[in-house]
Amino acid sequence: MAERTFIAIKPDGVQRGLVGEILGRFERKGFKLVGLKQITPSRALAEQHYGVHKERPFFAGLVDFITSGPVVAMVWEGDGVIASARKLIGATKPLEAEPGTIRGDLAVNIGRNVIHGSDAPETAEFEIGLWFDAAELNDWTPSDQTWRVEA
C-alpha cells in the first residue's frame, strides 16, 4: 500500500469557502483521496489530536478554535504523500509560507492557517486512526492511475 496522510481543512478554511480550492490542489498533484468527511470535532477529539501541545500556552485556544465549526477531514494516498503534502501546505506561519503554497496563498495569521497536515508516518497513522474508522477508508484505483505514476 502507498503512503497515507491525514489532512484537515480547519474551520476558517471551511467558513471561507476554500474546500474546493484545497481539494483541487491535492487532486491536481496526483494524490488519491481515500477518506473524506465533514465533522465538527468534539473537545475530546480535539484534545487527543493536539495532545502533543497540551502544556503549551496556546493549547486551550487551539482546541476552542478547532471545535468552533466544521472541519473537513481527509486521508490522501500516494508515494511520498506526507512530505509532498507538507510542501503543498507551506510553513505553519502563513507569512513565512512561500507563494504558491496553500498557506502562502490563502492564509495570513498563524491562528487561522486554514489547514493541518500530518508531519511524519507515525503522526499520520495516529491521526488517521483518531479521525476515521477503517471502514470509512476506500481502497480504489483511479481510472487515470497509469497516467499519474509509473508502475
From Swiss-Prot:
GO terms for biological process: CTP biosynthetic process; GTP biosynthetic process; UTP biosynthetic process. It is found in: Cytoplasm. Gene3D superfamilies: Nucleoside diphosphate kinase-like domain (3.30.70.141). GO terms for cellular component: cytoplasm. PROSITE patterns: NDPK, NDPK_LIKE. The keyword Transcription does not apply. Keywords: ATP-binding, Cytoplasm, Kinase, Magnesium, Metal-binding, Nucleotide metabolism, Nucleotide-binding, Phosphoprotein, Transferase. ATP binds at residues 10, 58, 86, 92, 103, 113. One of its GO terms (molecular function) is metal ion binding. The active site is at 116 (pros-phosphohistidine intermediate). Its EC number is 2.7.4.6. Homotetramer. Belongs to the NDK family. This is Nucleoside diphosphate kinase. It comes from Parasynechococcus marenigrum (strain WH8102).
